[in-house]
């Protein structure tokens, strides 16, 4: 397996996709444009970007046969397993070939993964079969958030069908924050386990679906880059205040418990997504204040003053404030830094995305980087496996079964479970 790549550079200054700084890409680009850059090696022209977006939009539709599969997956399944199942299913109905090459397959998977995720999520949650098509001009991020909101009962007509006119328009800042998250998750070099996995699979000559399936399975682990945002939210959600965070984090530190969302090295992506987390916190606070003001129009001045004090208290105990306190404690005590998963979790939560789906978002975004790495690996080398140092026993003679000493606590599993 090759140890050279032109796709992603991670250093102390920043992270670069094909030479472009992610600070610039998140400020002025879009996920679709970055996806094209990673897979095709250059930024698209205006015409190329229009055609690429059209190709991704084409695959928002998912075939009826796949819908039947998704409807059989139970609600307690992990969303990452849902995407992996869909990927494997596509390999059976549309296998890789000269006509159906890696570029077409990449468009299919990237374009259809949000549709797959939300078709399964809404059906398994409340039996709703959503229409996975949205407006032609909807960006990838806007399309994603519209599908998320299609599970609301208020959006369903009598025939249990959706029309695009009924979609609730997502808040612009939510769309941009998700777009930035997708860009930041799109690639992070071969140092990540999921990218190493896809390149290793590609080096064997395996088909693209198998390479992506391998990476998806690896991403399910909370220790892989992008796989821990879900665990971060489960850590933060029970914390009611910065003081509560102090107690719980210090208890975990004293008990030598692993705290997800932190690493020894500074993550250049964290300040970018943290800033968006702050913006969403302000927007949500203002929306809540407006709702409170509307509800309190008939209250007297004394009650209004009490409500204002309550709003200040809520601000002190907001998810953003608690998150920043946890980050502060972790650096002061352990000298570790919050990684991109930490504040992506707060961005997703403030955008009303269910915690269960957090890790699946990183899979959808990282598919672009995996595809780029598969293409590059295929061009560079054949199979090459990492070596291991054997630490087992020296050669020993075979012991007859009646002479063996029992020392294992071995139990045969109950086959009825």
Swiss-Prot record:
SUPFAM superfamilies cross-referenced by the UniProt entry: Citrate synthase
Gene Ontology terms for molecular function: 2-methylcitrate synthase activity; citrate (Si)-synthase activity
Region Disordered: start-end pairs: 284-317
Biased composition regions of type Low complexity, renumbered to the chain: 286-309
Alphabetized InterPro entries for the sequence: Citrate_synth-like_lrg_a-sub, Citrate_synth-like_sm_a-sub, Citrate_synthase, Citrate_synthase_sf
Gene Ontology biological-process entries: carbohydrate metabolic process; propionate metabolic process, methylcitrate cycle; tricarboxylic acid cycle
Gene Ontology CC terms, in alphabetical order: mitochondrial matrix
Pfam families: Citrate_synt
Family, per entry: Belongs to the citrate synthase family.
PANTHER family: CITRATE SYNTHASE (PTHR11739), CITRATE SYNTHASE-RELATED PROTEIN DDB_G0287281 (PTHR11739:SF25)
This protein's name: Citrate synthase-related protein DDB_G0287281
Organism: Dictyostelium discoideum
Higher taxonomy: Eukaryota, Amoebozoa, Evosea, Eumycetozoa, Dictyostelia
